Amino acid sequence: MILPIYVYGQPVLRQVAEDITVDYPNLKELIENMFETMDHADGVGLAAPQIGLPIRVVVINLDVLSEDYPEYKDFRKAYINAHIDVVEGEEVSMEEGCLSLPGIHESVKRGSKIHVRYMDENFVEHNEVVEGFLARVMQHEFDHLDGKMFIDHISPLRKQMIKGKLNTMLKGKARSSYKMKQVK
């Protein structure tokens, strides 16, 4: 089922999400709905707060990029109770967008290497060192779990330049090709 994506201004996007337990109701269905919602909106990642749930669940699908990044062929994963323990390596700038900020794309600096811990869909714990583009996507999505958005990483000048677009979202007048839940 395709769910509405919560847009900038929705309070849940600024909450710190909670860990969940193995008995969280309908988790498999939730994860499938998140993948379907993300795919429908042409995203590569989606965090539960973006569909209104303040829980630490993220889905990432990089298979759509496999022409440019062959290493991501068939890459489709769910991350439960995800945390980044260390960010290191060279800081790299790259343009980012976000399904919760339709129409906004800005250059964001992020570390090129991270140490992450999470559980998979079967609640098996993983500790990994991740580099490159996946590290960027994970940092972006895991930020949502801590109540942050990529615009929190841009300069005050750049933020001032997108203020009009942000105000449009705060008025509930954002436009996109996918179903959204806007501020009323």
Curated annotation (Swiss-Prot):
Its EC number is 3.5.1.88. The active site is at E141. Pfam families: Pep_deformylase. It is an enzyme of class 3 (hydrolase). Its cofactor is Fe(2+). Keywords: Hydrolase, Iron, Metal-binding, Protein biosynthesis. GO terms for molecular function: metal ion binding; peptide deformylase activity. Fe cation binds at C98, H140, H144. GO terms for biological process: co-translational protein modification; translation. It comes from the Bacteria. The keyword Metal-binding applies. InterPro entries: Peptide_deformylase (IPR023635), Peptide_deformylase_sf (IPR036821). Signal peptide: none annotated. Belongs to the polypeptide deformylase family. Removes the formyl group from the N-terminal Met of newly synthesized proteins. Requires at least a dipeptide for an efficient rate of reaction. N-terminal L-methionine is a prerequisite for activity but the enzyme has broad specificity at other positions. This is Peptide deformylase. It comes from Bacteroides fragilis (strain ATCC 25285 / DSM 2151 / CCUG 4856 / JCM 11019 / LMG 10263 / NCTC 9343 / Onslow / VPI 2553 / EN-2).
